Amino acid sequence: MMIRPIVKYPDPVLQQPAEPVTEFNEELRALVDDMFESMYEAKGIGLAAPQIGISKRLTVIDLSFKENPDEKIVLINPEIIHREGRQYEEEGCLSLPDIREKVVRAEKVTVRAQNLDGEWFEMDGEELLSRAFQHEIDHLDGVLFIFRISALKRDLVLRRIRKMQRAGEW
């Protein structure tokens, strides 16, 4: 297993739709292992392949943060097939360190995805899991959470990022 560096905004790989996963093999399993290790190292609960510079429709999630291996989720070529309700909570992102903003998301979602063997399955998520599904699938579509907030807030966030870049803190 290898810890891979997290790509930061404005890297182009974060802003374009990822390519579908077509090969389900040991290389994919190794990538998933690397993604979990990289996510844990960065203290995250979710990580999409574009966040480590790989344009593939693949994401990993672990709300237990290593406490319960049964809660590790791998979503390959995921899509949201049902949304219900509304929640407005603060989000952060490993590709946008130190940036946190409130984002409107569906309260409940159903995701359809493939597992490591290429088999399709459906999974429901509520509250934080629903938010994680939506946040990570957005990454696969080239959308960062700062593009789900108001233009005014986004402008303030982008100014803050530019200031950190000029100061060498980004």
Curated annotation (Swiss-Prot):
Binds 1 Fe(2+) ion. Removes the formyl group from the N-terminal Met of newly synthesized proteins. Requires at least a dipeptide for an efficient rate of reaction. N-terminal L-methionine is a prerequisite for activity but the enzyme has broad specificity at other positions. Gene3D superfamilies: Peptide deformylase. Its cofactor is Fe(2+). GO terms for molecular function: metal ion binding; peptide deformylase activity. The active site is at residue 136. Belongs to the polypeptide deformylase family. Fe cation binds at residues 93, 135, 139. The keyword ATP-binding does not apply. It comes from Acidobacterium capsulatum (strain ATCC 51196 / DSM 11244 / BCRC 80197 / JCM 7670 / NBRC 15755 / NCIMB 13165 / 161). Its EC number is 3.5.1.88. The lineage of its organism: Bacteria, Pseudomonadati, Acidobacteriota, Terriglobia, Terriglobales. Pfam families: Pep_deformylase. It comes from the Bacteria. This is Peptide deformylase.
